[in-house]
């Protein structure tokens, strides 16, 4: 397990450098991260590295108990670093909705997030305030790039 944990830490660092170095790679990452806004930046990086096409991910417990969806046989989870359990880090696994199926008539589909155009300016202003960024041309996309650079440098 320690070896796998080290692999995931290294993968997180490698992917963070890759997405920060290339605008094209950054935009691909954002396509994934936009669907996974409840996950931390390092978790989004790992999900992007393993399943860039993921649309909605959750633990097996959430899929089973809240969404009434079962994990398909043979599906492989996406390993994320869990540092919430005290000083020892461990791995936890999440599964994409494509790895699940509904339980008879009970299963639910998750509500996927979407941004309305009016929210773009508010989001850009919020990020500028949170990261002490200068206002730039390019709207929300450029503000997100700046915020990402700041996050990667801090991380």
Identify the residue ranges that each predicted region occupies.
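N-terminal accessory/interface modules of nucleic-acid-binding and processing proteins
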Residues: 1-155
């Amino acid at each position: 397990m320690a070896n796998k944990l080290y692999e995931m830490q290294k993968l997180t660092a490698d992917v963070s450098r890759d997405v920060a170095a290339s605008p094209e790679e950054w935009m691909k990452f954002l396509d994934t991260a936009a669907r996974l806004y409840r996950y931390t930046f390092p978790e989004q990086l790992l999900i992007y590295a393993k399943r860039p096409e993921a649309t909605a991910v959750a633990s097996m417990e959430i899929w089973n108990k809240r969404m009434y969806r079962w994990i398909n046989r043979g599906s492989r989870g996406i390993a994320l670093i869990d540092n919430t359990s005290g000083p020892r880090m461990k791995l936890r696994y999440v599964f994409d909705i494509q790895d699940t199926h509904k339980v008879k008539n009970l299963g639910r589909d998750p509500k996927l997030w979407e941004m309305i155009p009016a929210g773009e300016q508010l989001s850009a202003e919020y990020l500028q305030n949170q990261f002490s960024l200068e206002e730039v041309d390019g709207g929300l996309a450029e503000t997100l790039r700046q915020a990402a650079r700041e996050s990667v440098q801090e991380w």
